[in-house]
């Protein structure tokens, strides 16, 4: 086996925009990274997720194009 072919696996500090700090290890090559969202502030993990009502959107689409019909002239 060849020696020294793997990247260095070092400590990494990930800082979220909400202020949450996560310490982990990575071969990224950086000491710190900045995140937009993390498990402490993401709506899915915090339970503040909003469901989009697609049924109303489909009904609105059908209503908009209900009067149109395909007329093929031969």
UniProtKB/Swiss-Prot annotation:
Keyword Mitochondrion among record annotations: no
Pfam families per record: Ribosomal_L31
GO terms for MF: metal ion binding; rRNA binding; structural constituent of ribosome
Family annotation (PROSITE patterns): RIBOSOMAL_L31
Any one Gene Ontology BP term: translation
Superkingdom to which the source organism belongs: Bacteria
Cofactor binding comment, as recorded: Binds 1 zinc ion per subunit.
Similarity annotation: Belongs to the bacterial ribosomal protein bL31 family. Type A subfamily.
Role this protein plays: Binds the 23S rRNA.
Complexes and interactors: Part of the 50S ribosomal subunit.
Protein name in the entry: Large ribosomal subunit protein bL31
Originating organism: Acinetobacter baumannii (strain ATCC 17978 / DSM 105126 / CIP 53.77 / LMG 1025 / NCDC KC755 / 5377)
Gene: rpmE
